[in-house]
């Protein structure tokens, strides 16, 4: 199955804007609902920069040391001197062993840092990024003895992704960090982008992928969150695996839609779940036929 990034006109515009901001020395933040391609876009932009990429997934349990690094164990050094045959001289010392965290490694070596879902980490943890983005230095004084401040490599770049703050497990982005990044809002994908992605990821012909996308978009309605493009990719991939067609007369297609979309959509009244979903799927199957969409 093809894994290359599928760049439509919509994503091309986002890519060019992100590259411009990064080249000007600013951090870029892609923010939008789940399933809109934020992570894939961030990785695509990072690869275009031509530098090694360091990735990190946001986590509520992270501490600053999980980003910056810390001391791990001790190194013992013992020197025995027997230069004078009748005299032994011994010197012994112990030092802590420092390891670079991912942000430190990227800052030190000029790599591109992709911090995915970074608002899932606590604001106090992400505060270590403030000096990196503003003064281009990384403060290590609270963690490491000796080297207390690291100057950020001039080739260092950073890309963030996040879901809106109303998502479960997402912290509100602190103002100090918000002021240091350029946020590009990613909303619902246009139809052309969705069809291109579904066809590319699943291997289905464009016409068949378009029908699946139209059905998913119709069920989605005005809600840009569910079902997401991931549901369309799942349905298309399963059909491609089976060698089956997205036809209203195909009972397997109908059941796949029920299973995949039903796992994403939930209703307050579980007793109405199946009947409401069946009606919505049947309505979209009747509306989008191979003859009236290309």
What is each PLM-predicted segment?
Residues 1-210, 294:
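AAA+ P-loop NTPase catalytic core and its hallmark functional loops
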Residues 1-8, 24, 200-294:
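Alpha-helical lid/collar subdomain of P-loop NTPases
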